[in-house]
């Protein structure tokens, strides 16, 4: 015992075979925790002893012990239950081959049943062997006393082979003979920063927080590893060999008429500035009031023909444009142009500058004062940077903007077989190479089609691309996690995208095929460079308003920077996180609805009604499909901290006062069964050219790599409806479907961060119907005053009786609850006995009549699982799956 206790307190050094003593060491437990959290394991697996919350995977506390214990698993291939040792080999298999053996629940209501095959298999491309070992050492600490592994395990860091050129460094973004502009979060700046790399090896960062340059460096431009790995959220690194000349406060900060530095810290603090986040979260002054008092705004940037940006912003009555150039010899020139309605001051930070000169205005006591002007005038400030310039290594090749042929190939089986209804097939669209001919991470999360057939594809980290005449071409450089796109013209030359920091209008104003104008439509909301602060949308209504969704934040290092409202993960850092918002045609920002958690889908149905898809979690018992209506509350109270005058301590926003104000959802999407992370909708408006699903909403799931069909109805003023599986085994996480002019369905997918069952990090697949084959399936389910009417896509065979068919149906039901715990178990689960059934005269539907249906209060606000267990012989010679299923949410019974 004494020996074991001593080992528990030690830091264990472990040297790799042949490792040199001089190699860098790292703590594998600490690294394992980072990987565990960044891959989202913490969401599905509890690490707390005896945690009662409902999770989709087993509790890891007390699982991997010093003396390995037994645990029970189920082998899906044959249904066999057996016991295995929870040792290192089992751990490795549970990560690499997670579907080979499913853990059996050891406690609670699900004790004795196997967890679902939800966790994807993590290949080495997603979690390296080195990181896998680190996670092992981390999970070994999740036990009591001597059964736990050491709290610190020091390992040797493996040296990466030297790169022949910057193009060989993974995720390195070099600069050739054209200026490059990227939206990134850099250390020491806000998450809304714009990084600019010049061809001469000089780079700088313009930060909209101060409307000023904040960082200057030479050498390598950027390396986007931190943004392209797992869930991102860490500050982006500078390029290889970078040397910093200037960083910290603003270099040339505009001043208000009162002489104060323009500072938007309240809505965009510096990356990982916990102190500022806590300050403004608990401050009673509202964001809208701070914006009005500051009376300034960032307006975007315009690119010259060589790619150099001119930054546009407004301070009071003055609209200004600023350009920055850094010469080979380190001379910095900042030009400010504008028609000044009032005198404009700038505070200059002179640290690291020499030979400061101005052309126009007066520089005195560190303030550059520009006079009122009746016309547009340009004034310049120049200075020399201290220190020598660091050269960039020569590139073996330059950029190539030549359009690339779009290649399509039959979709190969992924981690699971691709299952689609008979008559449907899938093609994979091969992603384009980047400008330097390298394979790139290409996550197509925004797709739209112009009237002339141009397809616009926005991505998380690879920029915005267009497909014209069967060829890919890059339209706009790196956007910051773009998750949606709307086309404003007929050709795809004028678009609006979402990015984490803002809603942006992007324009090709000179017709050369490349975007040159980036207009900030809206950034009047909080963005803290948090990995979970996604901006979903936008979508546009007929009046020209743009609607978008702001996810809650998740700080993996602190529970004080966001208000989690008693929950374990997601919370608001203020600034309308957890809200649906809109921006009007004249640029006015308007909060629209609140109570959102992690909404990942939004769209207008063919009748013009707005809907959104919500992800399961705190205050959201399971994922759901809901009409999005102005002024309504949707369940998660964290976002209420953005209401006027509210702070986390305000009694007015505590859950008991809001739980009965919930806008009820229309359709539950059962967690672990159909959807864990539902994405964007696409309605079938093809007029039958995609099959028999006219008017239905197609929604994918990012985790399960599935495609679903949703049909809703309104009964007695209540929304409700059914969801039916359409496809399984897509290549990655399904996020953005869109119907193309040829009536096929193009599906943008991403598996990064929230690993998907499909297994791939990214994918773009096209689903095509052969135009003739209609498989037998459940088309949808509707409510009847006596039960449920199950509608089929093909008529039942003439010899099938109602009683015989009803005997093959199994109907069960349950309900979910919404509280601060992560998700909800299935409450009051029961099997429904059928008192009768009736087949319609056209044999396209059957009405199932549960015993006692409608009597008492036990029927409503429940989800009903309708399972046709054996379809053999039911639909003649029509192709059909062995079993059919649908889930129906019942909120009201027809009278």
Task: For every predicted segment, state its role.
Residues 32, 38-48, 95, 119, ...:
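The canonical Cys-X-X-Cys-His
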Residues 44-51, 65, 122-124, 140-141, ...:
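Detector for the c-type heme attachment site
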Residues 791-835, 869, 884:
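Short, surface-exposed alpha-helix to beta-strand junction/turn motifs within ectodomains of secreted
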Residues 158-163, 394-774:
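Beta-propeller domains with acidic blade repeats across secreted/periplasmic ectodomains
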Residues 392-394, 771-778, 797, 865-895:
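Acidic, Ser/Thr/Gly/Pro-rich low-complexity segments and short DxT(G/T)-type signature motifs
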Residues 33-37, 47-100, 116-126, 473-474:
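Gly/Gly-Pro-rich "capping" loops immediately C-terminal to redox-active cysteine motifs
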Residues 24-25, 115-157, 852:
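C-terminal capping alpha-helices of c-type cytochrome domains
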Residues 157-321, 331, 362:
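Beta-strand-rich N-terminal accessory domains
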């Amino acid at each position: 015992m004494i020996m074991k206790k001593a080992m528990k307190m030690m830091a264990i050094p472990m040297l790799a075979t042949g490792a040199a003593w001089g190699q860098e060491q790292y703590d594998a437990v600490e690294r394992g925790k980072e990987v565990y959290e960044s891959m989202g394991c913490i969401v599905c697996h509890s690490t707390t002893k005896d945690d009662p919350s409902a999770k989709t995977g087993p509790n890891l506390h007390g699982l991997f012990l010093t003396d390995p214990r037994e645990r029970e698993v189920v082998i899906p291939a044959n249904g066999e239950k057996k016991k295995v040792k929870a040792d290192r080999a089992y751990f490795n298999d549970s990560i690499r081959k997670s579907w080979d053996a499913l853990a059996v629940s050891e406690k609670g209501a699900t004790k004795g049943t196997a967890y679902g095959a939800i966790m994807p298999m993590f290949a080495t491309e997603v979690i390296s062997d080195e990181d896998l070992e680190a996670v092992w050492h981390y999970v070994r600490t999740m036990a009591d006393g001597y059964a736990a592994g050491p709290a610190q395990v020091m390992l040797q860091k493996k040296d990466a082979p030297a790169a022949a050129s910057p193009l060989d460094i993974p995720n390195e973004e070099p600069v050739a003979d054209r200026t490059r502009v990227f939206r990134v979060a850099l250390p020491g700046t806000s998450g809304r920063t714009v990084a600019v790399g010049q061809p001469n090896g000089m780079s700088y960062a313009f930060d909209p927080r101060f409307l000023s340059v904040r960082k200057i460096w030479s050498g390598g431009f950027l390396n986007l590893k931190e943004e392209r790995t797992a869930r991102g959220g860490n500050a982006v690194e500078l390029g290889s060999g970078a040397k910093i000349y200037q960083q910290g406060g603003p270099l040339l900060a505009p001043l208000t008429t009162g002489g104060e530095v323009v500072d938007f810290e309240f809505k965009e603090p510096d990356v990982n500035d916990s102190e500022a986040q806590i300050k403004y979260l608990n401050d009673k002054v509202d964001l809208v009031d701070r914006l009005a008092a500051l009376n300034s705004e960032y307006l975007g940037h315009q690119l010259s023909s060589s790619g150099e940006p001119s930054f546009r912003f407004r301070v009071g009555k003055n609209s200004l444009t600023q350009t920055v150039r850094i010469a080979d010899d380190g001379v910095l020139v900042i030009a400010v142009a504008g028609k000044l309605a009032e005198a404009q001051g700038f505070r200059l930070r002179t640290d690291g500058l020499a030979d400061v000169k101005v052309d126009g205005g007066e520089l005195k006591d560190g303030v550059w004062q520009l006079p009122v002007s009746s016309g547009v005038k340009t004034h310049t400030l120049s200075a020399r940077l201290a220190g020598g310039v660091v050269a960039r290594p020569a590139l073996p090749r330059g950029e190539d903007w030549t359009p690339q042929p779009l290649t399509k190939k039959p979709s190969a089986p992924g981690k699971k077989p691709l299952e689609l209804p008979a008559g449907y097939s899938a093609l994979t669209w091969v992603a384009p190479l980047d400008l330097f001919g390298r394979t790139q991470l290409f996550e197509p999360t925004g797709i739209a089609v112009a009237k002339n057939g141009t397809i616009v594809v926005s991505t998380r980290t690879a920029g915005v691309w267009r497909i014209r005449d069967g060829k890919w071409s890059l339209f706009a450089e790196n956007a910051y996690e773009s998750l949606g796109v709307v086309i404003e013209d007929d050709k795809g030359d004028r678009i609006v995208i979402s990015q984490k920091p803002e809603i942006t209008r992007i324009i090709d104003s000179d017709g050369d095929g490349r975007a040159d104008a980036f207009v900030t439509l809206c950034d009047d909301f909080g963005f803290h460079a948090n990995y979970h602060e996604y901006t979903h949308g936008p979508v546009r209504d007929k009046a020209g308003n743009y609607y978008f969704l702001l996810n809650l934040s998740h700080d993996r290092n602190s529970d004080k920077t966001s208000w989690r409202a008693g929950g374990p993960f997601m919370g608001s850092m203020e600034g309308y996180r957890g809200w649906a918002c809109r921006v009007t045609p004249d640029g006015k920002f308007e909060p629209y609805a609140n109570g959102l958690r992690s909404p990942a889908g939004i769209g207008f149905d063919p009748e013009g009604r707005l809907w959104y898809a919500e992800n399961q979690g705190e205050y959201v018992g399971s994922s759901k499909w809901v009409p999005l209506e102005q002024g309504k509350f949707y369940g998660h109270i964290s976002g209420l901290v953005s209401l006027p005058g509210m702070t986390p301590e305000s009694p007015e926003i505590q859950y008991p006062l809001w739980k009965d104000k919930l806008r009820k959802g229309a359709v539950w999407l059962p967690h672990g069964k159909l959807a864990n992370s539902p994405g964007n909708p696409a309605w079938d408006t093809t007029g039958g050219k995609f099959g028999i699903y006219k008017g239905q909403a197609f929604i994918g799931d990012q985790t399960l790599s599935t495609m679903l069909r949703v049909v809703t109805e309104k009964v007695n003023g209540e929304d409700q409806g059914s969801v039916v599986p359409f496809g399984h085994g897509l290549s990655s996480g399904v996020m953005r479907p869109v119907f193309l002019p040829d009536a096929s369905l193009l599906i943008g997918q991403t598996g990064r961060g929230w690993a998907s069952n499909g297994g791939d990090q990214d994918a773009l697949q096209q689903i095509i119907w052969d135009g003739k084959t209609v498989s037998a399936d459940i088309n949808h389910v509707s409510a009847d005053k006596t039960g449920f009417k199950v509608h089929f896509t093909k008529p039942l065979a003439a010899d099938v009786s109602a009683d015989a068919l009803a005997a093959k149906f199994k109907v069960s039901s349950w309900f979910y609850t919404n509280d601060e715990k992560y998700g909800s178990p299935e409450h009051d689960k029961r099997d429904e006995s059928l008192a009768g059934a009736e087949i319609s005269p056209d044999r396209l539907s059957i009405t199932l009549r549960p015993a006692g249906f409608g009597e008492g209060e036990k029927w409503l606000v429940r989800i009903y699982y309708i399972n046709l267990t054996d379809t053999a012989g039911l639909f003649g010679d029509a192709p059909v799956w062995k079993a059919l299923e649908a889930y129906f949410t019942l909120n009201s019974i027809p009278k």
